[in-house]
Amino acid sequence: CASFHKNIFEELKKDYIDQKLVKFEHHSFPLDLAALNAELIVRCHADNQKKFQLLGEIYKKQNKWAVGSDIKKINESIKKIGSELGLDKIKMNECLKNEDAQDQILNERIEAQKKYKIQSTPTIFINDKQYENEHKYKLFKKAIEKILKKNEI
């Protein structure tokens, strides 16, 4: 996911999302406790723009925080990123302990796995076409342009 965000998402955002030509939805699919906790902190933000900003920072710095097996150290690293973007540490601690939010995220993952047969991350859908292993900007651009061309009046 971090590689997609760094190498593809920013271009898609600039060329299509910011231009309001396509709608982008991000759905969490945590594969471990560190990813689950990162998503819990992302969801602490009420504002969608802030969520994407935080998500971007978490992906950019993933090689720094998602290391080792000490979940306390990992959580502190994620909270540091959140703090840098203005999230309150007390609120982040509350979010990390929110069992309802944890259950919701994990249930969303289970449902997505069942419904869409997701086997790996990131899995990208453009309309109903699934792109699981092919993550190249040119491929997505071609698919989007084809759809946009079809929808011209």
How does the language model describe each region?
Residues 2-83:
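Structural alpha/beta surface segment adjacent to cysteine/selenocysteine redox centers
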